[in-house]
Amino acid sequence: MFFYLSKKISIPNNVKLQCVSWNKEQGFIACGGEDGLLKVLKLETQTDDAKLRGLAAPSNLSMNQTLEGHSGSVQVVTWNEQYQKLTTSDENGLIIVWMLYKGSWIEEMINNRNKSVVRSMSWNADGQKICIVYEDGAVIVGSVDGNRIWGKDLKGIQLSHVTWSADSKVLLFGMANGEIHIYDNQGNFMIKMKLSCLVNVTGAISIAGIHWYHGTEGYVEPDCPCLAVCFDNGRCQIMRHENDQNPVLIDTGMYVVGIQWNHMGSVLAVAGFQKAAMQDKDVNIVQFYTPFGEHLGTLKVPGKEISALSWEGGGLKIALAVDSFIYFANIRPNYKWGYCSNTVVYAYTRPDRPEYCVVFWDTKNNEKYVKYVKGLISITTCGDFCILATKADENHPQEENEMETFGATFVLVLCNSIGTPLDPKYIDIVPLFVAMTKTHVIAASKEAFYTWQYRVAKKLTALEINQITRSRKEGRERIYHVDDTPSGSMDGVLDYSKTIQGTRDPICAITASDKILIVGRESGTIQRYSLPNVGLIQKYSLNCRAYQLSLNCNSSRLAIIDISGVLTFFDLDARVTDSTGQQVVGELLKLERRDVWDMKWAKDNPDLFAMMEKTRMYVFRNLDPEEPIQTSGYICNFEDLEIKSVLLDEILKDPEHPNKDYLINFEIRSLRDSRALIEKVGIKDASQFIEDNPHPRLWRLLAEAALQKLDLYTAEQAFVRCKDYQGIKFVKRLGKLLSESMKQAEVVGYFGRFEEAERTYLEMDRRDLAIGLRLKLGDWFRVLQLLKTGSGDADDSLLEQANNAIGDYFADRQKWLNAVQYYVQGRNQERLAECYYMLEDYEGLENLAISLPENHKLLPEIAQMFVRVGMCEQAVTAFLKCSQPKAAVDTCVHLNQWNKAVELAKNHSMKEIGSLLARYASHLLEKNKTLDAIELYRKANYFFDAAKLMFKIADEEAKKGSKPLRVKKLYVLSALLIEQYHEQMKNAQRGKVKGKSSEATSALAGLLEEEVLSTTDRFTDNAWRGAEAYHFFILAQRQLYEGCVDTALKTALHLKDYEDIIPPVEIYSLLALCACASRAFGTCSKAFIKLKSLETLSSEQKQQYEDLALEIFTKHTSKDNRKPELDSLMEGGEGKLPTCVATGSPITEYQFWMCSVCKHGVLAQEISHYSFCPLCHSPVG
């Protein structure tokens, strides 16, 4: 981090300043001083030039207002940024609140206790409350609108400072005796703060400043120290919270007057003065520290006595009140950033996330890739890759092959230019300094350095990828202590015990090239090692402590920026004679520059470098500077006589939206001069100038200029000089062209002015060349346009190619509907199928399948698409069209379309379907899914098996005593399946019998075959018995309830034939009941006799029946009134009349209705009341 003074504003009449405060949001600067002086200033930059943004832009005072109202010396000024208010107080205790009205500051409120002087005022984080403390111990908390919230007198205490916590729950009060007391936000005392920094301090001390950073811009890392307390004797402590028992301790070694955090809590500035060595007067200085107490640097400030400091809102400037002046210093922060292959990598913190947000901004395509990285330490780049040095995440253990560094606390992550991690390395030393070359990564702590010869995947052979062996690992990773003298042989090993040994002369900077590694130490010693075998070659001695080291492209010179921003150069190979007459290697060059904060060597010239000095960029050639360029950018890259610079300050104001305007290219003087010569003087003179100052970039410039003028001889010579083989070939090709306009068009195309080139071709009536140009560029939209606009016939194959390429363009962007239009025209069936599928346009997909010829290679793919969405029929059609019946059957099975599966299997003589069906059915039965198995058999047209299972269910339900209606339905369903089975057998036989035999004969043969198959099964002979039994059982009860007792008796009498289906006890109980109601006591008596003889009844039940019979037959004789009619019903056997299923009566007429499904009859006069058959419920035809 570097800082330098940039501006000075003097206060009229030499009035001494006491305080200064910079409004972070609006940029106003308030300063107060003696004799009631109070001024509000505003510095504004006016520039439209993109290069002059940020610190480099000239700034002027846009506001300089003196506020009248104080008479005594103004001692405290504080801003309320949320509500744009300024609160000031003077030595008489007068407090004034100012507000901005129509561009100037006016008094809003005044308050004067007249008792004591205000020592400190503090607004809370949201600007709602202010706390004011007086010297006599009075505390007042007020609201932003001027109302008093509470007040308190702390007896016997002299107050000097106050500050709020970030959440406004805690107040810290600093006392005149140096103590700090912690109170809650209602003014209740909680505890005294432990001041570890004052251990062993004697004498009177006072608090110089308390500043609590509120986390508005996020924290450098989670749980980062943010509360700074500093005393006038230079002792300071930085705490994580008010009760932190283990704070960061600093001894600044100076008399302190004030402290302040920057806008993001990453830098603490401490202002004060020091006794200068060998002088009586004090020296004003500002020291800068990190939250962890690391010293970042010292800024010396002229003048007698510094009294206050304040940061600007962006953290790039700091205002210092010294005597009757305000000095401004510019800050050049240590951003975590890098540049690799057109990508700017930068990191920033966000208040809503604990990690660093690392952005990989591809400046060529203006795309950005964001990664969140925990515990980021630094970013280092080289070529196409970058290294992120981070703290290891405790929650994630390392991989198995990292066992030898287990417990490693840091990680070096190798990433490509879009942030993809390629290779992490866990190490056990703090990577304070990281350097990177095309082959090596070097990380150094203060005592040791680690080298890793990295390889990236594209360079690895398959063999190496397979053998990540320990030996190879050790060959690639080494560790060396800075005090060791390695010889360059294989003596470096991965031994972390070396890092534990300390050193008296720690490392302070490193740099490396492909050939050498340079390590700088705090004493000024520079150690030079060879690479890739690390051997100590040379030690040099400098009289400064290096902060940043940099090697030129041939590793002959070293640039050193020290901690105070002085740039010097060292020639590593020069041999000189020292004062004692001995010859030594290495020489400090004469050039020295001050206030330097960045430098970069040219990649292609060892004598060229660019450096940043204050807000100017200088380019040096052989240590001679060119005229400076005004800018504050960080240098990304210097090659081809062009410098690429990035305005990181501007980018980090809005890091989520980097703007290409913040990337600036500067051309160095020789390039500018050559360009001017070519334009004004001509090619001949320019070529002489370039001959005297040769550089490939200048020769290329000359070649391009010669091409523009079609001076092919000069162009070819220049291309040869810059070794541009493509350019030479292009010139040769141009030489063979006859037409001047054709040459001109080619040249225009070469320079990327494609519209102009196309226009020229079309004017020459060479549409083919225009199309060829667009083809090379891949601009298919324009190709299509040109093909369609031409007068002659367009090339069909090219048209198709163009349509397909445009279809691909839309498909890549998932605009399927647009893609379809072009694929149709390009007849690209493969991509069409994909688009229809993505659009869920299955009709279009089906039509496409229909339009394809048989056995087309796309059909199986389309069929699979239908399978994936469950469209069985379309899938089967597609499979059959490409002669894949097995796949069609598998699809039907997969989608549970078993009937279709069986049909296909039969049609294509496939034997395995039966076994597959049986396997699936048994699987269902095992899981007790009998109904699913029945459905499976039914769909597969295996009606007989389905019926068997159905009868089984019906029998089980009957045994359970379920509702009779349900049982009847189950028996009807079973019988219907049997009927379907009969029908199937007949049809199968009809199909088999060919020739002259009649239909009746074939049907009969089918039945005979079926007879042979089913002799064993009783239900195939009389499938309807179960249904009949429960039908009559329900019908008899219904007739009984309706009061038709005679018909009920007739129906109940039928049940005697069904004792094997309905339990006899239920049959004869119902019969007895109906007979008794019908007064047919003879029949009733027979029913009771039957009941008594049943073996299934218990003796108690039999006794109950006996008692009931006794009761009935003591009153009535056991005779039937209508004997003959009942007798005819009681007779069974062959001569039995058919029964009407609607009434239960026998059918005596010759004509009656018969159901076509169950073959049961209904009396002719009854059927007119029914729409469906009373037994099987099939429609009455």
Swiss-Prot record:
SUPFAM superfamilies: DPP6 N-terminal domain-like (SSF82171), WD40 repeat-like (SSF50978). Its main location: cytoplasm. The keyword Repeat applies. Induction: By TNF. GO terms for cellular component: axoneme; centrosome; ciliary basal body; ciliary tip; cilium; intraciliary transport particle A. One of its GO terms (biological process) is cellular response to leukemia inhibitory factor. It is found in: Cytoplasm, Cytoskeleton, Microtubule organizing center, Centrosome; Cytoplasm, Cytoskeleton, Cilium axoneme; Cytoplasm, Cytoskeleton, Cilium basal body. Pfam families: Beta-prop_WDR35_2nd, Beta-prop_WDR35_TULP_N, TPR_IFT80_172, TPR_WDR35, Zf_2nd_IFT121. Keywords: Cell projection, Ciliopathy, Cilium, Cilium biogenesis/degradation, Cytoplasm, Cytoskeleton, Disease variant, Ectodermal dysplasia, Repeat, WD repeat. WD repeats lie at residues 4-43, 61-100, 105-143, 147-185, 193-241, 246-288. It is linked to Cranioectodermal dysplasia 2: A disorder characterized by craniofacial, skeletal and ectodermal abnormalities. Clinical features include short stature, dolichocephaly, craniosynostosis, narrow thorax with pectus excavatum, short limbs, brachydactyly, joint laxity, narrow palpebral fissures, telecanthus with hypertelorism, low-set simple ears, everted lower lip, and short neck. Teeth abnormalities include widely spaced, hypoplastic and fused teeth. Component of the IFT complex A (IFT-A) complex. IFT-A complex is divided into a core subcomplex composed of IFT122:IFT140:WDR19 which is associated with TULP3 and a peripheral subcomplex composed of IFT43:WDR35:TTC21B. Interacts directy with IFT122, ITF43 and TTC21B. Interacts with IFT43. Interacts with CFAP61. As a component of the IFT complex A (IFT-A), a complex required for retrograde ciliary transport and entry into cilia of G protein-coupled receptors (GPCRs), it is involved in ciliogenesis and ciliary protein trafficking. May promote CASP3 activation and TNF-stimulated apoptosis. This is WD repeat-containing protein 35. It comes from Homo sapiens (Human).
